[in-house]
Amino acid sequence: MFGVSNHTAENYFGYLKEAFLFVGVRKFSYKASERLRNEKCYVVDVALSTERIDTFSLENLGWRLENVVCIELLRRYHHQYAEIFYYKEKSFEIDFLVAKNGIVQELIQVSYNVTSERTRQREINALLRGAKKFNCRNLTLITFSTEQTIEKDNETINVLPATKWLLESKR
């Protein structure tokens, strides 16, 4: 894309991670090669992204919220021998998956705003499909300001505003 080889880009990304400017979240898979190959990038400090043209666009606010959640998950689970992943198939994606010893403990979706029915259904359906696939009952949807409990398909989804989720003590 920019005339830089994959090898060079991987090296640069590695340097940025070593400098604690970026963190990588790997794709959840039982195959090590797939985990190593697919990594999502998050900035450690969202203030580093203020030079982006779309700083205050709704899309960027969602990206920033997802970054904040990622950093908090890494902080919460750093000493608990848990790993943070994302999961993606052709038809759905889970933003964050918390696993201990290969067993999925929690599925988390992040969406700045779920007032649009389409967005709301996309996030809920991803959690429900993930719950079924990984036999996980701990389902959370983090938003900017919405709080409610959703009961659907014999599952309970806790919808929490980011402020409340960030301030809660972890079990």
For the regions a protein language model found, what residue spans apply to each?
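Conserved beta-strand segments of alpha/beta enzyme cores
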Residues: 40, 83, 138, 156-158
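Domain-level recognition of nuclease-like catalytic cores that cleave nucleotide substrates
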Residues: 144-171
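Short, hydrophobic beta-strand segments that form beta-sheet elements in well-ordered domains
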Residues: 137-143
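Accessory nucleic acid-recognition modules appended to NTPase machines
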Residues: 1-104
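Arginine/glycine-rich "motif VI" loop of SF2 helicases in the C-terminal RecA-like domain
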Residues: 76-79, 128-136
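Active-site-adjacent loop/helix micro-motif of nuclease/hydrolase catalytic cores
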Residues: 115-125
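Short glycine-/acidic-enriched loop or helix-start segments at secondary-structure transitions
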Residues: 53, 119, 150-152
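Active-site ExK catalytic segment of metal-dependent nucleases
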Residues: 104-116
